[in-house]
Amino acid sequence: MQKRELYEIADGKLVRKHRFCPRCGPGVFLAEHADRYSCGRCGYTEFKKAKKSKS
């Protein structure tokens, strides 16, 4: 994936589609997986919250 694919223009402003890594700082994005976000540079991982189903 190229860096230009991680941004979009909305209402004349540049908007990031992904989040930055809190350890590495701006410019290093977190990859989005089905159950987690992970940094390919430092290995930082955040797990997504599981949605509770109504029963």
Swiss-Prot record:
Cofactor: Zn(2+)
The entry's keywords: Metal-binding, Ribonucleoprotein, Ribosomal protein, Zinc, Zinc-finger
Highest taxon, organism lineage: Archaea
Molecular function in Gene Ontology: structural constituent of ribosome; zinc ion binding
GO biological process terms on file: translation
Zinc finger residue ranges, C4-type: 21-42
InterPro entries, A to Z: Ribosomal_eS31, Ribosomal_eS31_arc, Ribosomal_zn-bd
Disulfides per UniProt: none
One matching Pfam family: Ribosomal_S27
GO cellular component, one term: ribonucleoprotein complex
Binding-site residues for Zn(2+), renumbered to this chain: 21, 24, 39, 42
Cofactor: binding comment: Binds 1 zinc ion per subunit.
Subunit annotation: Part of the 30S ribosomal subunit.
Family statement drawn from the similarity comment of this UniProt entry: Belongs to the eukaryotic ribosomal protein eS31 family.
Name by which UniProt lists this protein: Small ribosomal subunit protein eS31
Organism: Thermoplasma acidophilum (strain ATCC 25905 / DSM 1728 / JCM 9062 / NBRC 15155 / AMRC-C165)
Gene this protein is translated from: rps27ae
